[in-house]
């Protein structure tokens, strides 16, 4: 059977060339490939500045990989696709499947307009919805058995993209690269597939074998920093998994990849839980309205050094250590008594690695209302967390210069020392011990002995 003349590869959350099944399918189906990225105005209006600026850099890197032939334009997806299909006689539009509400609804609208979409692969090693309980073919609600099922299911080997393939030369109209400036003073990681592969190579050489020991310590560069690259699809999780062995450290890293896949699976099976409670009873709890204390949390001025260092890291880098994400989330929900969605939206505005499923369900885990949730009575102590995971205070000093003059024994509780507030560090907005008891009292009111999922 003869090949079609041109196929479109429509890039979305997969800004890479290697290990890209949809791109490979497009190459194999036609004589030449038209690479396309469509800027969506609604998505742009809702996205954070840092994320957009990073995306702009990533698109430039992808364009370079394609020999400066990426077609890029802002517009309605149906209109743009129909124009290119007509101009180039395209029969098929190839995509990586998407499972979050926005992407799924967009693709359904495109297909309803009569455009044929060919789905190959997804942003995950195992597509959401495929890992099911062998007993009754229902989705898992708890991570540990999901992980066992996920490993048993397995995943394909990375797809091999040809080194050379024919790419359509775009007209000037389709070279509308966006100008998304990075906010002043913000320093994010380098964007693009090459940067992702380089970072992962460095991690496998210098960090992977000690990952289980170092991953929780905020002052150590002990994590892979792959979350942003996975969010934009600059690297595929299979590429990471392909390099893992069976040691404890490697398995710990594998389990972190599986957490991302678990949350994607949970959201796929419960599509409104990106904005709504997985455990509905938590809607009944008494919550406060955001005010001055929330503003202090947003600015990293709560008076709790470990919390403030984390929030300032987020503002400066568009990224935050996973340990501190849990600590600041617990502080917002259980010390300030605000609903998790408020913090989730703030993260969405500032995280470069913002992932709908991981973010929403990470917040719900900490709040105690999610699947496989942290027990409702677990309330992170922001002082003890700092002492445990930033013992010498190096992380705090890096982001909270008002406390840099304090010793390791002083820096976690500056209010106990005469010199603690001498450089302008703010006083505590709340007393943790008091708010912990208040949080437990509110939880007791809804009798949250064991949060139940919506399908329990």
Describe each region flagged by the PLM:
Residues 1-158, 249, 358, 433, ...:
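Trp/Phe/Arg-rich N-terminal binding region typifying the photolyase-homology
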Residues 221-402, 408:
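Active-site-proximal binding-pocket segments
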Residues 51, 55, 299, 303, ...:
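Residue-level preference for long, well-ordered alpha-helices that form the structural scaffold
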Residues 136-282, 389-390, 394-456:
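Glycine/tryptophan-enriched, flexible segments
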Residues 18, 54, 58, 192, ...:
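Soluble or luminal CAZymes and related metallo-dependent hydrolases
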